From Swiss-Prot:
A cellular-component GO term for this protein: membrane
Source species: Arabidopsis thaliana (Mouse-ear cress)
Primary subcellular site in the record, as a coarse category: membrane
Ranges of residues in domain t-SNARE coiled-coil homology: 184-246
Gene this protein is translated from: SYP23
Region (Disordered): 1-31
Additional remarks: In cv. RLD, the 22 amino acids extension regenerates a typical syntaxin transmembrane domain. In cv. Columbia it encodes a protein that has no terminal transmembrane domain, but that is however not detected in cytosolic fractions.
Name by which UniProt lists this protein: Syntaxin-23
GO molecular function: SNAP receptor activity
Source lineage: Eukaryota, Viridiplantae, Streptophyta, Embryophyta, Tracheophyta
InterPro entries in the record: SNARE, Syntaxin, Syntaxin/epimorphin_CS, Syntaxin_N, T_SNARE_dom
Tissue occurrence: Expressed at higher levels in leaves, flowers and stems than in roots.
Amino acid sequence: MSFQDLEAGRGRSLASSRNINGGGSRQDTTQDVASGIFQINTSVSTFHRLVNTLGTPKDTPELREKLHKTRLYIGQLVKDTSAKLKEASETDHQRGVNQKKKIVDAKLAKDFQAVLKEFQKAQRLAAERETVYAPLVHKPSLPSSYTSSEIDVNGDKHPEQRALLVESKRQELVLLDNEIAFNEAVIEEREQGIQEIQQQIGEVHEIFKDLAVLVHDQGNMIDDIGTHIDNSYAATAQGKSHLVRHQRHKDQILL
């Protein structure tokens, strides 16, 4: 079963696979890896769309929060799938493991490597855009009845108007303080988000390096399988040739 099979709709979640099968068999581990890759690929597509929205009129704090949650979700999927793939690889080195399973696991490792590359690209683009652009926020404003421009400020007017002007000024100062505090919070949140992206980029990079070693190791194992098959085929062909020559020699003796 390959990653392409799962894209046709036969993927299952990691959790459901564990609950149904118990995760105890070799096949379950391979299924978990395939399911994880499918989920990562789907989530990375969503992540790409969200990243492309950064810097547009749709770039809001709500979108940044959704982007943050999606990024964390993918990161956890990557860790879980990487662990399962290592488990499958260790199993493949045991004696008596089906050669077909080894080949399937090797293909899944390459699929995992490809989808990780896409996620890394999206991560770097997200870090770049979140650094450059700030989300659009709706700033609070005073009701029109409180704007000082509409109030007669002459001292000989009614005390009610003077009281209204004082209240208007107070409201403006409160809003100004709130806006400053809000902007500081937005800046702090952006900086924290960028730091989290950089940290996750580092984590995924380490997983990618480990995966490259695993893919190389599995490639050697697949080459060994191919060599073994070729040698077996050559030995079989040679054996048949010997039998034919022996039969011909026997026939000549009988004649």
